[in-house]
């Protein structure tokens, strides 16, 4: 099987299948990747350990911090205590939550994050209401714009622009 065909089948399997964890499997959250196809994960109870990525996923599927996985336990492992069985994307997570198979420890994290986001957006909305309506400070503020570091940045001062206007008149 060629690499492209293998990648196609692996991606189709990961994105298309809806898998429920068995009694031995558990759902974990990725905390980081120390390297060598190992990922530091945390269970809903707060236990941290390393999980290895099987060869079928390597260089085909990418896992980032904050993703959720279904892992198979490795009994004889001291540091590496699990092997990744399945990667859970948003659709998979919603389905498991609807079926009641989602761990309580992870649902509390999500509701906590949502509450924090609402609080921060509430603060921003009150700040927007506190500004006078006549000021157009949003148009003058360029701090939110992307800065291209590949181009030389020239500083324009008001004095130079005023003197250029005087010379033109």
Curated annotation (Swiss-Prot):
The keyword Cytoplasm does not apply. Disulfide bonds: none annotated. The keyword Glycoprotein does not apply. It holds the Pfam family eIF-1a. It comes from the Eukaryota. Residues 156-169 have a biased composition (Acidic residues). Residues 14-89 form the S1-like domain. GO terms for cellular component: nucleus. GO terms for molecular function: RNA binding; translation initiation factor activity. May play a role into cellular response to oxidative stress. May decrease cell proliferation. Belongs to the EIF1AD family. PANTHER family: RNA-BINDING PROTEIN EIF1AD-RELATED, TRANSLATION INITIATION FACTOR-RELATED. This is Probable RNA-binding protein EIF1AD. The gene is eif1ad.
């Amino acid at each position: 099987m060629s690499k492209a065909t293998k990648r196609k089948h692996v991606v189709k399997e990961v994105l298309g299948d809806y898998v429920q964890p068995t009694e031995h499997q558990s759902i974990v959250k990725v905390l980081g990747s120390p390297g060598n196809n190992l990922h530091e994960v945390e269970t809903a109870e707060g236990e941290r350990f390393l999980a290895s990525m099987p060869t079928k996923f390597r260089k085909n599927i990418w896992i980032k911090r904050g993703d959720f996985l279904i892992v198979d336990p490795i009994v004889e492992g001291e540091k590496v205590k699990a092997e990744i069985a399945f990667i859970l994307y948003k659709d998979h997570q919603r389905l498991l939550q609807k079926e009641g198979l989602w761990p309580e420890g992870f649902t509390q994290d999500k509701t906590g994050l949502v509450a924090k986001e609402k609080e921060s957006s509430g603060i921003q909305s009150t700040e927007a209401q506190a500004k006078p309506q006549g000021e157009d400070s949003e148009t003058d503020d360029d701090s939110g714009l992307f800065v291209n570091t590949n181009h030389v940045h020239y500083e324009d001062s008001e004095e130079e622009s005023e003197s250029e206007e005087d010379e033109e008149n």
